[in-house]
Amino acid sequence: MRSNFRIAMVLFAGVAIGSIAVEGLHAQGAKLKAYVVSESDVLDAKAQAAFIPAIRKAMAETHHGRPLYTATGRIVPIEGGSPPASVGISEWDSLDDAVAFYKSKAYTDLAPQRDKAVKVIRRFVVEVEK
């Protein structure tokens, strides 16, 4: 009876250790999500209203982009200096995907429309921690 118990415990331990090892190997290849934050001043509200759907469409169609979460939402300062007039936040499957989009033809083709609508103060990508 004791030997059956020992065999069962050894099998259980082997399965548990194997599961942990497989999970660890899977996590090594996983990319971390990233968020692009764009701070800008609005130059022309009508041009911005036309630009937002265009950039949303380009993000959705290229490089695994997720929707532009906000571009005209309310901004409330908490710490530091004055906030920018407009902030855009978008989610990406990885930092590489985000950078690739902003270097892509789909994005650069929108530059004239963007430059008429907003003046980009700062844009950066933040990779999510593990």
Language-model features, listed with the residues they occupy:
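Residue-level marker of structural boundaries
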Residues: 57, 107, 116-119
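Short S/T/G/P-rich N-terminal loop/turn motif that feeds into the first structured element of a domain
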Residues: 18-105, 126-130
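Short alpha-helical segments used as structural interaction elements across diverse proteins
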Residues: 3, 45, 111, 119-120
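C-terminal end-helix/capping segment
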Residues: 115-130
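Bacterial N-terminal signal peptides that target proteins for export
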Residues: 1-12
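Terminal signal-anchor or tail-anchor transmembrane helices
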Residues: 10-20
